[in-house]
């Protein structure tokens, strides 16, 4: 029988100080299946604290500008010294920081500098646990443009990890064939954990953070929202992409391809079951038709009208080509008989909207082109809409009854999957209204 394998990733709050690292030790040792541990850089210890990665990025900027950085370097070193002393272990911190200092003096590199938080944390945690340290520069493979090479990473991670009994892997970064360090975007340690889980064929990928699972709504907007016990990979990807910050959406994709369950847990409350992310609900589990609601502000809605744009003229394709040539991503595109609606982040439009509109007029000759700014985009998702077939309609009715203007609607087929545009000033009202509707089901 195959030995059970669990990959456990611990986020920044879970390694913020020595006390948190001791909690990691208790969690890891409570289940022998937790063989492979992925860690982030130390996060905030209190609300006004600064994350180590932010300190490192500031350090890089000062070095790049030729400004003195000794004080900033000492501050970062002190963070790690406090963790080491608190754990009562010996660790060559001076040597590690001499290497970092030399790199900053000779050739400052942003990704290399930013990655040193995860690198040092993983070495310290490995030392404390008595596990083998694995540097992802050996096994997380990027190309020279900073894009992940998934197939090569899978092979090299498998070869690096499986022969080991137990290991700690630094999250967030890897390297290209020349040895140059590249990082994922912020939150990328989640991706490292998911890649490791796939490489070793894990039975479970645990993501340990500072909340006991994923909330059905943003707790900064809704007071004491319900924790979701089960949700699908699709639901989590939608909610994560639209602003739910517990897990990086790309991490979900890797695990879902091999149907590895993801369990979001709380380092401070390990007794809580958290949220389980699965392909299909276990038999007998009943869940709310509306799994959750999340969203993002800072959107603009472009409305383009021309008679019979859907008659095979290629109007929509030409519009998307314009965006592609400008490397201008969009959140979604909705095509009607006589119109196209595009939702694009406002900050991406600010410097180019006049030129963009002029190109649209010259290329497509629309009857009308309009712009709505200061919009927000809200995702409402659920897998059980077949049991409440009017859920989509009732969500919209709830918003209308609250006097909330709806600027755009994009509705998926079958399951509950709504993307709704509302003015930014009513964003929080809309989130609360949808959550209130959810709780009434």
Task: Tell me what each language-model feature is.
Residues 4-6, 34-37, 131-132, 165-168, ...:
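Structural motif
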Residues 1-248, 252, 345, 421-423:
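Nucleotide/pyrophosphate-binding catalytic subdomain
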Residues 273-441:
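A conserved regulatory-domain signal marking ACT and ACT-like small-molecule sensing domains
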Residues 248, 259-266:
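Acidic/polar loop patches that form or flank catalytic/metal-binding clefts of enzymes
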Residues 39-58, 264-281, 337, 342:
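Terminal amphipathic helices with adjacent charged low-complexity linkers/tails
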Residues 139-141, 212-213, 270, 338, ...:
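Positions that flank functional sites
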């Amino acid at each position: 029988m195959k030995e059970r394998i669990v990959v456990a990733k611990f986020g920044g709050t879970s390694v913020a100080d020595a006390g948190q690292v001791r909690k990691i030790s208790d969690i890891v040792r409570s289940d022998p299946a937790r063989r492979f541990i992925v860690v982030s850089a130390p996060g905030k210890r209190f609300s006004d604290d600064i994350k180590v990665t932010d300190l490192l990025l500031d350090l890089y900027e000062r070095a790049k500008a030729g400004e003195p950085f000794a004080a900033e370097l000492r501050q970062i070193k002190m963070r790690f010294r406090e963790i080491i002393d608190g754990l009562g272990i010996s660790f060559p911190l001076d040597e590690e920081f001499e290497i970092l200092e030399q790199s900053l003096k000779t050739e400052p590199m942003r990704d290399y500098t930013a990655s040193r938080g995860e690198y040092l944390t993983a070495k310290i945690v490995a030392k404390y646990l008595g596990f083998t340290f694995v540097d992802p520069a050996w096994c997380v493979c990027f190309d020279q443009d900073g894009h992940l090479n998934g197939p090569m990473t899978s092979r090299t991670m498998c070869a690096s990890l499986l022969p080991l009994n137990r290991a700690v892997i630094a999250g967030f970064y890897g390297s290209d064939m020349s040895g140059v360090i590249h990082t994922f975007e912020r939150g990328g340690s989640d991706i490292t954990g998911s890649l490791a889980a796939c490489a070793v064929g894990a039975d479970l990928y645990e993501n340990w953070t500072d909340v006991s699972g994923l909330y059905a709504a943003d707790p900064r907007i809704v007071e004491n929202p319900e924790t979701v016990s089960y949700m699908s990979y699709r639901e989590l990807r939608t909610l994560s992409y639209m602003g739910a910050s517990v897990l990086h959406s790309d991490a979900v994709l890797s695990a879902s391809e091999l149907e590895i369950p993801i369990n979001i847990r709380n380092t401070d409350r390990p007794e809580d079951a958290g949220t389980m992310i699965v392909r299909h609900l276990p038999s007998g589990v009943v869940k709310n038709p509306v799994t959750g609601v999340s969203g993002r502000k800072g959107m603009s809605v472009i409305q383009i009208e021309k008679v019979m744009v859907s008659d095979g003229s290629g109007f929509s394709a030409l519009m998307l080509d314009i965006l592609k040539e400008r490397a201008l991503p969009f959140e979604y595109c909705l095509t009607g008989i006589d119109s196209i609606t595009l939702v694009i982040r406002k900050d991406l439009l600010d410097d180019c909207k006049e030129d963009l509109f002029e190109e649209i007029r010259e290329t497509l000759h629309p009857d009308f082109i309009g712009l709505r700014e200061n919009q927000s985009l809200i995702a409402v998702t659920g897998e059980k809409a077949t049991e409440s077939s009017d859920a989509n309609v009732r969500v919209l009715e709830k918003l209308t009854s609250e006097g909330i203007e709806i600027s755009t609607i994009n509705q998926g087929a079958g399951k509950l999957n709504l993307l709704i545009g509302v003015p930014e000033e009513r964003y929080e009202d809309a989130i609360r209204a949808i959550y209130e509707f959810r709780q009434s089901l």
